[in-house]
């Protein structure tokens, strides 16, 4: 049954050119539900293969958009472990074109929250225009 669910998730991913992930920052990481999704799609021989030079992704020609929400400000700091983690997991399966838009500082007061959301919305609109 687990292999069937995994095959279904992989088929969904293979059927589309763009993957959009909406990802809150939970304790400097990704939500457990997203980790479980990655556990379903990261399969040797299906989404990547092992070679003498390391793993090679099999899902070519796809891109990902990561939309993130964060209570504090982490982008560009050592505490932003989420962005490299997602890039590594996506890269493992061959998705190396990854755009990110983060609304940061959402727990730092209403004024900061509104400014962050306005900026994120503008970045999303610009990203959509480029697709």
Outline where the language-model segments fall:
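Helix-loop-strand module that forms the ligand-binding subsite of alpha/beta enzymes
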Residues: 5-84
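Glycine-rich, highly charged phosphate/nucleotide-binding loops
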Residues: 1-14, 120-127
């Amino acid at each position: 049954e687990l292999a069937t669910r995994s095959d279904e998730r992989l088929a969904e991913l293979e059927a589309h050119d763009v993957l959009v992930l909406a990802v809150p920052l939970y304790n400097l990481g990704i939500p457990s539900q997203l980790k479980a999704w990655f556990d379903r799609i990261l399969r040797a021989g299906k989404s990547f293969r092992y070679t003498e030079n390391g793993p090679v992704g099999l899902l070519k020609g796809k891109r990902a958009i990561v939309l993130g929400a964060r209570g504090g400000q982490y982008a560009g700091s050592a505490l932003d472990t989420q962005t490299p983690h997602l890039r590594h997991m996506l890269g493992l399966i061959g998705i190396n074109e990854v755009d990110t838009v983060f609304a940061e500082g959402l727990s730092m007061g209403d004024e900061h929250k509104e400014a962050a959301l306005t900026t994120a919305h503008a970045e999303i609109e610009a990203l959509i225009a480029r697709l």
